[in-house]
Amino acid sequence: MSELSIYLDFRAQPGEPPTATDYDDGVRLVQAAERLGFAHVWTTEQHGVDDGYLPAQLPMLAALARETSTIRLGTAVILLPLTHPRRVVEEACVVDVLSHGRLTLGLGAGNYPNEFRIFGADPSGRRQAMDEGVPFIKAGLSGGILPDGSPVNVPPVQQPIPLVLGGLLRGPAGRAARLADGHFAYSYLDPELELARFYRETLRPSLERHGRGPEFRLIFASVIWASDHAEREWRETVGPAFIYQQRKYAEWEAGMPSAGGYAFSGDVDDLRKRLLIGRPAQIADRLLGLREAYPFCEIVVWARLPGVPAELALAHLETLAGEVAPALADRPAP
């Protein structure tokens, strides 16, 4: 069985910071996802940008913890080189207590130059920050004594809080296989090809080398749109929103080696052919085919891209829950 989850950055309109009403709409989407049986709400972060991309994941998840009761709450991912590992542990444990044990902590290295500049961090130190920070944090996720000899102020409910790591290169994949409970991947354009290649060439060898079995969670995020009116909705609303999202990523990534395939070309109709866009039955079949090559246990769907009305995003969640999720549940994972 594969679970469906949602991904949110809490942007509502292209180029505009969110209002309190926009945040309220985001909370309602999460509550709807919980009611519809989605497994997780995952958040993400960026810093120093002009369009309201969420900069503070754990505070947001603390708020969502009090507005929900069953859906799990995940960070995908906290940019560890930009913060102190102790602060991550302490805030994560508080969220786990507030949520009665529903947090999954996702960590990553980041790669956008401006974020490192505004935090006074050296991008060349990302690997060291992860190599030192991840074991420190992992030691605290059960609420015990940290490697510096000091206690965690507030022990978590879960023993331990689950830990996942992101990153599509060999080093991050190996670190996840060695230290984490799972790996968080993302793939937008040509996901069937890209994820199969990543698993075959990078992740599976790391998992085999470290003796990881079926308990290791493979999670991936993508832009998916399942609708009986998929072509029209893509052309009029979802496609322009996706292009805005990807252009902002490319803008932020300028000057850095590609770490996830953000560069793209073509118009809205050309791009549609490279994404998981189609009728619900078509999307279910494609996801089942992808699972043969990339044995994921959880699919994370962008719940609302900037510019997609909240009502349309909600209707899409209902379609996913009613027509795509049952097909994934009916056929066991390989």
Show where each model-derived region lies.
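Internal, glycine-rich beta/alpha segment that forms the wall or movable "lid"
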Residues: 2, 84-182, 186-215, 257
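Short, acidic/polar
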Residues: 20-32, 91, 167-175, 282-289
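Glycine-rich, proline-tolerant flexible connector loops at the mouths of alpha/beta enzymes
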Residues: 40-64, 79, 111, 187-191, ...
